[in-house]
Amino acid sequence: SAASDVYKRQEESRSCINIWDEVNHVQTEFLEPGFTVSEEEFKGFEKHFTELVKKADVVAMSGSVPKGLDGTAYQRLVRICKEAGKKVILDTSGKLLEMGIEAKPTMIKPNIDEIRMLTGKSCDNFQDMVDAAKQIHADGVEIVAVSLGGDGSFVVCDDGIFRARVPKIDAVNTVGCGDSMIAG
């Protein structure tokens, strides 16, 4: 079973609402901005997180971080996990991903655009994508699971390169697909 522990704050957590218009086949997202976290508050969270990590086997971190935090937020949390000898999965994007992989998470789940950003490679074909993922793996990320959207995914790890193809379906909504992938 998965344990949970809440780090309480005065502010309410944000809501993210996704609406699917079945008539026009249009998706609309409402993403509340959320609260701002100061460096001092984040240090308090890091202290709490350090204790929590001791109880975990694997830690998954995904998405964005609150306003007020810079690109090092996940990097710092990944380091805490690694220092505790825990496996850590990082599923984020942009500067958070770029800085986060410097701490060598156990696994990342980038998409093609993120692989391009991390390696500077064009990734115009499958072999280029694999080579880019191999570069990240060689730099210390144990498992690089690359999402290819409707074309499935592939994984680069010490045991080799593995490709997963998915059946063609009419996707109604892709919200949560990446989260589901790292959960599996």
Residue ranges and their predicted role:
Residues 2-7:
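Short, small-residue-biased leader/transition segments that mark boundaries at the very start
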Residues 8-9, 18-20, 31, 61-62, ...:
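Short beta-strand segments
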Residues 8-15, 38:
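Gly/Ser-rich phosphate-binding catalytic loop and adjacent alpha/beta segment
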Residues 12, 33-35, 64-67, 114, ...:
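Short glycine-rich anion-binding loops that position phosphate/pyrophosphate groups of nucleotides
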Residues 19-54:
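Conserved phosphate-binding/catalytic loop of the ribokinase/pfkB sugar-kinase fold
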Residues 53, 101-102, 138:
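A short, aliphatic-rich alpha-helical micro-motif
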Residues 58-129:
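Conserved beta-alpha-beta core of the PfkB/ribokinase-like small-molecule kinase fold
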Residues 79-83, 98, 126-184:
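Conserved phosphate-binding/catalytic region of the ribokinase-like
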